[in-house]
């Protein structure tokens, strides 16, 4: 593997992650902070590592990420999507494996807007019969 850098953009909800991957020892840096420091929740850290663990490249690549917008869950999902795209740039043969795990597809779910006359997006005001 050469010292080439691979890039992938990931999105989830309102978060956008720019992911750079290059040959290394498995360090993951998010917004100039180590992964364990940036994400307090173990589930978020697990989500970020999923594509690397699937293709067994956890200790072969260094990942550098800048992520903006959204909350922790959205950002973790965006980073996962970005890492997946960077891995596909590195080796297109990984696509079927990553596709079967559901990492290639962009999760299109977003918050539904609140409608006029309703309490929330779908919650209607309480109905009183009498």
Curated annotation (Swiss-Prot):
The keyword Signal does not apply. GO terms for molecular function: RNA binding; structural constituent of ribosome. Keywords: Ribonucleoprotein, Ribosomal protein. GO terms for cellular component: cytosolic small ribosomal subunit. Pfam families: Ribosomal_S9. InterPro entries: Ribosomal_Su5_D2-typ_SF, Ribosomal_uS9, Ribosomal_uS9_bac/plastid, Ribosomal_uS9_CS, Ribsml_uS5_D2-typ_fold_subgr. It comes from the Bacteria. PROSITE patterns: RIBOSOMAL_S9. GO terms for biological process: translation. Belongs to the universal ribosomal protein uS9 family. This is Small ribosomal subunit protein uS9. It comes from Shewanella frigidimarina (strain NCIMB 400).
